[in-house]
């Protein structure tokens, strides 16, 4: 899906699998992931690789696509990650995003004392970098003149 907008910024996404159920009037987005630790996907991939951002954007892409295709009355189901084991030992698992995880992906969240930025903050940071043509330092560190407080 190319050319959909989130907070004034244009995106494109290439989803692995999309199922349109015309009888139930639903659209389901799937993303395929292969990892060495299927049961630790949440901490070792979803958080570490920021897959929550991908899930959020795929959902927005599916909403835009459905509207363009004349399926605006279809329910866009929350994304699912189909996770397989790279060693082919463990069975695959399906991880389903929830409304809470979508809200976290949008707004950012904390997990085990670590902050994870949301799409809203990231797009704001990107807009700031575009507007100011500053790419070699984060907005936060720029605004504090490069002074970072410890502890």
Put a short name on every predicted segment.
Residues 1-40:
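Catalytic cores of nuclease domains that cleave nucleic-acid phosphodiester backbones
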Residues 36, 42-49:
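Conserved helix-adjacent loop modules within structured domains
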Residues 37-41, 89-92:
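Short acidic/His/Gly/Ser-rich catalytic and metal-binding motifs that mark active-site loops
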Residues 47-52, 57-151:
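Metal-dependent nuclease catalytic regions and adjoining charged, substrate-binding loops involved
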């Amino acid at each position: 899906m190319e050319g959909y907008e989130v907070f004034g910024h244009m995106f494109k996404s290439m989803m692995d699998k999309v199922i349109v159920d015309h009888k139930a009037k639903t659209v389901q987005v799937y993303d395929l992931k292969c990892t060495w630790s299927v049961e630790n996907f949440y901490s070792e991939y979803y958080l570490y690789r920021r897959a929550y951002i991908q899930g959020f954007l795929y959902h927005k892409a599916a909403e835009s696509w459905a509207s363009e295709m004349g399926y605006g009355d279809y329910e866009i189901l929350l994304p699912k990650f189909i996770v397989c084991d790279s060693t082919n030992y463990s069975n695959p698992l399906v991880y389903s995003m929830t409304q809470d995880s979508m809200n976290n992906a949008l707004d950012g969240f904390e997990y085990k004392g670590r902050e994870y930025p949301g799409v809203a903050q990231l797009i704001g940071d990107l807009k700031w970098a575009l507007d100011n043509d500053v790419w070699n330092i984060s907005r936060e560190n720029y605004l504090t003149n490069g002074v970072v407080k410890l502890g």
